[in-house]
């Protein structure tokens, strides 16, 4: 008679499985041998699977080129090719287009000519500034200022300024006649002037009541006030000189 089983013996026992992963089965792959080291024992399949190396491809390409054909050397052509020089171009400023509003210059004197059209395009403040430089009045509207400048410009071309007169006097040389004049005057009655005397050598004119003071000079029968040349003659000869409009009337 069988012995009774203890409690818990009738239950199946648990079997612990190992966590190690099974190793995959690897097949041995035969490496193809190169063409140079293949022997007669090697199979034909292994020989067909051999691929040429890059060195062998280059060697085969060189053998295919005929000897008579000239192959240009890249190194020589690259060495002989000149390197283009970089040239920087200078930037030239754009030329200003000549407009009709540009300042007009007198061909004879080289001075600016005042144009009425050009003045009318200027502002009142600019016109007043131009009037100030010419010692003109700055009162009035734009038309009055333009007219004033035009009139002043016309007078300036007829009557030279003081600076121009002084410059001409400095450059004027003394005539040879004045350098040879004696210090002694030979006064004779002035033709057409009963109350005046004149010296033929210098052309100086004196009053009959004061023959020591020159008041003008005579030229082509007309009496004029003393100019810079005749004043210089008076200084060199030690003659007093004076000029008043009352003497010449």
From Swiss-Prot:
Among InterPro entries, the record links this protein to: SAP_dom, SAP_dom_sf
Q: Known SMART domains for this protein?
A: SAP (SM00513)
The protein's matches in Pfam families, at most eight in alphabetical order, are given as:
SAP (PF02037)
Region Disordered, annotated ranges = 1-110
Q: Where is the SAP domain?
A: 119-153
Q: Where is the composition biased (Basic and acidic residues)?
A: 1-12, 22-38, 95-107
Gene3D superfamilies, per database record: SAP domain
Q: What is this protein called?
A: Putative SAP domain-containing protein 049L
* Organism annotation: Frog virus 3 (isolate Goorha) (FV-3)
């Amino acid at each position: 008679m069988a012995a009774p089983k203890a409690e818990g013996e009738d239950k199946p026992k648990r079997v612990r499985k190992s966590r190690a992963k099974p190793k995959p089965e690897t097949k041995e792959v035969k490496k193809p041998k190169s063409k140079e080291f293949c022997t007669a024992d090697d199979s034909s399949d292994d020989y067909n699977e051999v691929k040429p190396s890059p060195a062998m491809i280059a060697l085969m390409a060189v053998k295919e080129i005929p000897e008579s054909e000239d192959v240009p050397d890249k190194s020589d052509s690259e060495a002989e090719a000149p390197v283009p020089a970089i040239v920087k171009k200078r930037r030239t400023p754009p030329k200003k287009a000549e407009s009709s509003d540009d300042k007009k210059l007198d061909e004879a004197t080289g001075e600016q000519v005042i144009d009425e059209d050009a003045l009318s395009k200027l502002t009142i403040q600019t016109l007043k500034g131009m009037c100030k430089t010419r010692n003109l009045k700055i009162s009035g509207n734009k038309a009055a200022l333009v007219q004033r400048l035009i009139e002043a410009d016309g007078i300036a071309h007829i009557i030279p300024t003081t600076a121009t007169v002084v410059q001409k006097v400095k450059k004027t040389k003394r005539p040879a006649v004045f350098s040879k004049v004696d210090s002694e005057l030979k006064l004779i009655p002035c033709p057409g002037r009963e109350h005046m005397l004149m010296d033929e050598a210098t052309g100086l004119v004196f009053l009959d009541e004061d023959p020591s003071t020159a008041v003008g000079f005579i030229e082509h029968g007309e009496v004029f006030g003393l100019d810079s040349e005749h004043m210089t003659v008076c200084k060199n000869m030690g003659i007093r000189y004076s000029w008043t409009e009352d003497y010449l009337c």
